[in-house]
Each structure stands twice: as structure tokens, then as C-alpha cells.
């Protein structure tokens, strides 16, 4: 059964969502992300995806205090991403309570460092973030497109030991337009042992059911919850 992993995106210490990674589209949903996390946990959620959007924009971890508060005040298993660009950033994330850390831009820009982290911490703790636009990997909080093609990028890191990947189709993210099921099917056909977390486009329960039926192991989503298109009660069939 697919694993439900709600997302809390943070700007200025607040729970927000963007559309297609556009910071100008920011919408604040809650001033207190800890309260959001506690509500998730109270309804049976066990995993949480926390994104430091300030960190992604400024190239170093910024909102670690929020991560720390969520980790202290809930028992959620947290994966954290956004602005993790150095050994110090990674240390801050783990010391602040993340059980897993997602690296996206760093895996493109400094593969040697990312592979070092993978060797030191292992594939249970290091997640590869593959943010995709038309099969190309995007970096720097999705503002820039790299020359990396999705499938060679994945293959390279899977060969180096990566087992967990969060793949976001940027064209879908925050748009409530439905996830890229065909893309995820293609990825799982090529890499059947991958623990793939689909991200972007989830707008209704049918989308989660479709991802589950496609064999996708995990799903990250936020806006559909915050906008009320999916309720925590709806999700209980998967929790």
C-alpha cells in the first residue's frame, strides 16, 4: 500500500505552498507548522516531508528551528530538504531531528559531496531529489534547468547506492492538475527496486488511488490537503 507523506513547506517559519515553484505565488496556510504536523500525527500520519523554501533560495539551511520543534513535539518520521548544500547543513538537519535528508541541487552540482554523504550515512538516510521539467533536472529551488536528463541521472545514483527518490514533476506541482502517472510508471519499469515518492499534482483521492494502483511506493502532497480537496479522514484507508 502506498505510503502517505504530507508536505510542510516553510517560508519565514510559516507553512506555505507555491505553484510550480514560483515564490511569488506563495500562499500562507498556517503561521505555525508545528500545529499542522501535530494534526497530521493525530490522524494517523507517520511520515512527514519538510521543505525549507528559504533554504532552497539562499543555498543553506534556514528554518532548522521549525524542524527542531516538529521533531520534539511529534513522533513523525521526518525527511527534510531545501538548502542542504554542505556538510554543516547536513549536520544541522540531522541534529535538528530529521531522520532522512533529501539532496536535489547538490546531487547535480557537487556529485562527489552527495556521494560522500551516501557513503557516510547510507541509503536509508539520504534521499535523492529529482525535480523534473520535461525530463530535465531542475536546480536552485527549481529556478534553473540543468543539462541532466532524468533517466541517466537516476541510473548513475542508483548504481552508487541510492534507493529512495522523491520525484517532482514541476509542471504539476501546486497546480492540483493530477500527478504524472505515466512518468512514474516509466521510472518503476526501469528501476523496479526503487522506493519512489511521487510529488506534484495530487488534487483528489482518485489521484492517490491511481498512484497506488501504479505501484508507486510513496506520495508527497500538500496543497490538496490545505485547500480541503482531500481530508485527513479520507486518507485513513491508507494509514
Named regions from a protein language model:
Residues 57-79, 115-131, 176-204:
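Alpha-helix-loop-beta-strand connector modules within alpha/beta enzyme cores
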Residues 74, 78-100, 182-221:
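Catalytic cores of alpha/beta
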Residues 12-15, 20-24, 98-173:
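Conserved anion-binding
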Residues 9, 40, 48, 93, ...:
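Conserved, mostly hydrophobic/aromatic
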Residues 15-61:
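N-terminal beta-alpha supersecondary unit
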Residues 112-121, 212-239:
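C-terminal helical cap(s) of enzyme catalytic domains, especially alpha/beta-barrels
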Residues 47-65, 105, 167-177:
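Glycine-rich, proline-tolerant flexible connector loops at the mouths of alpha/beta enzymes
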Residues 29-41, 85-91, 145-156, 208:
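Short, acidic/polar
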Amino acid at each position: 500500500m502506498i505510503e502517505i507523506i504530507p508536505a510542510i513547506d516553510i517560508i519565514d517559519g510559516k507553512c506555505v505552498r507555491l505553484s510550480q515553484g514560483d515564490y511569488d505565488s506563495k500562499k500562507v496556510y498556517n503561521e505555525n507548522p508545528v500545529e499542522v504536523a501535530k494534526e497530521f500525527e493525530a490522524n494517523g500520519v507517520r511520515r512527514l516531508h519538510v521543505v525549507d523554501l528559504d533554504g532552497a533560495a539562499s543555498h543553506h539551511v534556514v528554518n532548522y528551528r521549525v524542524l527542531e520543534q516538529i521533531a520534539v513535539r511529534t513522533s513523525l518520521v521526518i525527511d527534510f530538504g531545501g538548502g542542504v548544500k554542505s556538510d554543516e547543513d547536513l549536520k544541522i538537519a540531522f541534529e535538528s531531528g530529521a531522520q532522512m535528508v533529501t539532496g536535489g541541487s547538490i546531487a547535480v552540482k557537487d556529485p562527489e559531496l552527495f556521494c560522500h554523504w551516501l557513503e557516510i550515512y547510507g541509503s536509508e538516510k539520504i534521499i535523492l531529489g529529482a525535480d523534473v521539467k520535461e525530463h530535465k533536472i531542475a536546480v536552485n529551488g527549481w529556478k534553473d534547468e540543468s543539462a541532466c536528463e532524468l533517466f541517466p541521472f537516476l541510473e548513475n545514483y542508483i548504481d552508487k547506492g541510492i534507493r529512495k527518490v522523491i520525484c517532482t514533476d514541476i509542471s504539476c506541482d501546486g497546480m492540483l492538475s493530477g500527478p504524472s502517472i505515466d512518468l512514474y510508471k516509466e521510472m518503476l519499469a526501469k528501476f523496479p527496486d526503487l522506493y519512489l515518492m511521487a510529488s506534484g499534482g495530487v488534487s483528489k483521492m482518485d489521484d492517490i488511488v491511481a498512484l497506488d494502483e501504479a505501484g508507486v511506493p510513496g506520495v508527497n502532497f500538500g496543497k490538496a490537503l490545505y485547500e480541503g480537496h482531500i481530508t485527513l479522514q479520507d486518507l485513513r484507508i491508507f494509514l
